Regions:
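Conserved activation segment of eukaryotic-like protein kinases, specifically the C-terminal portion
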Residues: 185-200
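Conserved alphaE helix
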Residues: 68-69, 76, 100-104, 108-162, ...
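C-terminal lobe substrate-recognition/regulatory segment of protein kinase catalytic domains
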Residues: 248-294
């Protein structure tokens, strides 16, 4: 037993430095993926990094497949608008940690995430700055043969110089169009509920890049409303909110939707008219931006705007990069969702979410639970991840 312990202590992981080379400064994130820390290089005392702890749910099964996939994808995706993986570090196995090595993914540090910025009432994005954020987000999407599958404001990092970095590829996977008429069988247990597109909510497993474009549309709208525009508590409720905003989900507007697994099992509101422009107009002052949102938040994924057409849309003409740098330079304190107070319920709620509230008592209960929703949402995603792991094939 003593020999085994000594072997574990002395074992050297090639190409994997010890995590002790970095000094943790503060915890800046926590979720289904584990924890994220701001840290600095002990040697230089200057270089700042982000360290993402790999969550070992079941160490008997070895290194998590989701972490392996994330590492592989990040090694392939070297792009200005994708977070940069610097290295993988590990702690030394000793008696004090029960001979369990902890691994960290080490990234270039980004000062803010979009959810944290939107939580701060003192951060005000101009139209040009919103254009610049969306242009960079769509640039991150257009390069992919990858499905990100977790588009949300908290996963959009922004540096102090205004450069956007898409982060958290823990649910991402390589994408290819189905061959020989055999459909893909991807898991639909992905994407945080408030940003999940209707095809996934209805059980589609043969999906593609449009799932990320729906999330991009939700993020774009959120930059004006300052809160997620559809805040359902269940998959059924999320579909109701989508129907109330985008119109009834029927084969007439979405051919083939009735063949999806959950189409007949969900209660889908009837006689709902499409109201995307009507609902967003009070917040989105630019008519071109409102038109782009109308093209991104489309029920039928085959009719949803793709990254290329969205980038060429009139609404993204002449974004103001320098202005966003000046705006962010005014805020020296980092802003992350984890460190921010809960955002108030979205402005959109009174307009198109009334049907989701059953009675005043339920409404009050929802208000009381609102502050706990982020943690509840994280628990849901953990459950989805655990349920779907067998379906997530290796690269």
């Amino acid at each position: 037993h003593a020999q085994k312990q000594k072997y574990i202590e002395d074992y050297n992981f090639q190409y994997c430095d010890e995590a002790s080379k970095y000094e943790k400064i503060a915890k800046i994130g926590q979720g289904t993926f584990g924890e994220v820390f701001k840290a600095k290089d002990r040697k230089t005392q200057k270089k700042i990094v982000a360290m993402k702890k790999v969550l070992m749910d079941n160490e008997k099964e070895g290194f998590p497949i989701t972490a392996l996939r994330e590492i592989k994808i990040l090694q392939l995706l070297k792009h200005e608008n994708v977070v940069n993986l610097l290295e993988i570090c590990r702690t030394k196995a000793t008696l004090s940690n029960r001979y369990k090595t902890t691994f960290y993914l080490v990234f270039d540090f980004c000062e803010h995430d979009l959810a944290g910025l939107l939580s701060n009432i003192n951060v005000k994005f101009s139209l040009g700055e919103i254009k610049k954020v969306m242009q960079q987000l769509l640039m991150a999407c257009i390069i992919f043969t990858i499905l990100h599958r977790d588009m949300k404001a908290a996963n959009v990092l922004i540096t102090k110089t205004g450069i956007l970095k898409l982060a958290d590829f823990g649910l991402a996977r390589p994408f290819s169009f189905s061959k020989n008429s055999a459909p893909n069988r991807y898991t639909n247990r992905v994407v945080t509920l408030w940003y999940r597109p209707p095809e996934l909510l209805l059980g589609d497993r043969n999906y593609g890049p449009p799932v990320d474009l729906w999330g991009a549309g939700c993020i774009m709208a959120e930059m004006w409303t300052r809160s997620p525009i559809m805040q359902g508590n269940t998959e059924q409720q999320q579909l109701t909110l989508i129907s109330q905003l985008c119109g009834s989900i029927t084969p007439e507007v979405w051919p083939g939707v009735d063949s999806l697994e959950l189409y007949t099992k969900m209660e889908l509101p009837r006689d709902q008219k499409r109201k995307v422009k009507e609902r967003l107009k009070p917040y989105v002052k630019d008519p071109f931006a409102c038109d782009l949102l109308d093209k991104l938040l489309v029920l039928d994924p085959s009719k949803r705007a793709d990254s290329d057409s969205a980038l060429n849309h009139d609404s993204l003409d002449r974004p103001h990069a320098l202005r966003s740098v000046k705006m962010l330079a005014q805020h020296t304190q980092s802003m992350f969702e984890y460190l921010a107070p809960p955002r108030r319920p979205g402005h959109m709620r009174p307009h198109h979410q009334q049907a989701a509230v059953i009675n005043p008592t339920a409404a009050r209960a929802q208000q009381l639970l609102r502050r706990k929703w982020l943690s509840r949402s994280s628990i849901l995603v953990v459950a989805f991840l655990l349920l779907s792991t067998p379906a997530l094939c290796c690269l």
